[in-house]
Design a protein with these regions (language model features):
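Glycine-rich phosphate/pyrophosphate-binding loop and the adjoining helix
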Residues: 60-120
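Helix-loop-strand module that forms the ligand-binding subsite of alpha/beta enzymes
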Residues: 1-56
């Protein structure tokens, strides 16, 4: 979960991915959830997709969640600014993340970070 900070991902979120360069997140599925106090929230997703996977080898799943007007969001009961389908979207994405995780278990046996930890 990354809050929008001046139209971008927070420096702390970016720093976390810089610190995880020793395989902690390698070949594990991830779901980006962006939250915004206004109508934004898309830029942190684009930023994390473009810059956080290179050295971490984290595998972002194709889906993402943007919760806009986050102050009004409470699962199951939320204000007028939150779409009714938001809870279903969150459930769908979490189920998909679990499915990716379960299906990637067989790939873990093939990973050779010792010889090929940095790509090419």
């Amino acid at each position: 979960v990354v809050p929008e900070y001046g139209g971008m991902a927070t420096p702390q979120a970016k720093n976390l991915f810089l610190l995880c360069g020793d395989g902690e997140l390698a070949h594990k599925p991830g779901l980006i959830v962006s939250i915004s106090s206004g109508n934004g929230g898309s830029y942190p997703i684009a930023e994390l997709r473009s810059s956080s996977y290179k050295n971490t080898h984290l595998m972002w799943i194709p889906e993402n969640i943007i919760i806009r007007n986050v102050e009004d969001y409470l699962p199951g009961s939320h204000g007028d600014l939150i779409p009714e389908w938001m809870d279903n979207r969150v459930d769908y994405c979490l189920k998909l993340l679990i499915a990716y995780s379960e299906n990637m278990q067989s790939l873990i046996k093939l990973i050779n970070r010792k010889d090929f930890g940095n790509g090419m």
